């Protein structure tokens, strides 16, 4: 069994610490960082989850590094703020016509609408494989109807 994941990826950074007082200059919490974790996010998270199940998986994703850094109060696990860097647009995917789709038992499209995949790309992928799962932030349209499953997301 081999699965292909295609879509936008990011690096998810979590900085855990404490925020026990307000800043004297402005009514904002003073955050004291204690530990940091990093994981793959978006399509990279899908890839890591599938890989953790022992399933062979390939990932086609953006080259640009999009980072989402969350500052989390460690006692309550509440996010205080999220800081995004380079999160506007990804370079569009290239080479979809060169992928050996028949080598995969399924294709997962993880589209966060950052520009890596356009509607025509999704339609093309759906035309090349019988088992396509779509998780998208785009408005679902007729170009996606070739997919087996579609998960709809709210706008972030």
Annotate each language-model stretch with its function.
Residues 1-22, 26, 34-156:
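Ribokinase/PfkB-type carbohydrate-kinase core domain
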Residues 31:
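Central beta-strand plus flanking loop segment that forms part of the substrate or channel wall
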């Amino acid at each position: 069994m081999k699965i292909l994941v295609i879509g936008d990826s990011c690096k998810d950074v979590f900085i855990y610490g404490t925020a026990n007082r307000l800043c004297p200059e402005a009514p904002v919490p003073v955050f004291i960082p204690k530990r940091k974790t990093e994981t793959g996010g978006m399509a990279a998270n899908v890839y890591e989850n599938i890989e953790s199940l022992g399933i062979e998986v390939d990932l086609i994703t953006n080259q640009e590094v999009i980072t989402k850094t969350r500052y989390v109060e460690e006692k309550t696990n509440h996010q205080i703020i999220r800081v995004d860097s380079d999160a506007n647009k990804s370079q569009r995917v290239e080479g979809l016509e060169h992928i050996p789709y028949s080598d995969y038992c399924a294709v997962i499209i993880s589209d966060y609408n950052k520009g890596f995949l356009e509607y025509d790309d999704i339609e093309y992928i759906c035309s090349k494989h019988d088992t396509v799962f779509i998780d998208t932030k785009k408005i679902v349209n007729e170009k996606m109807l070739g997919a087996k499953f579609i998960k709809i997301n709210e706008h972030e």
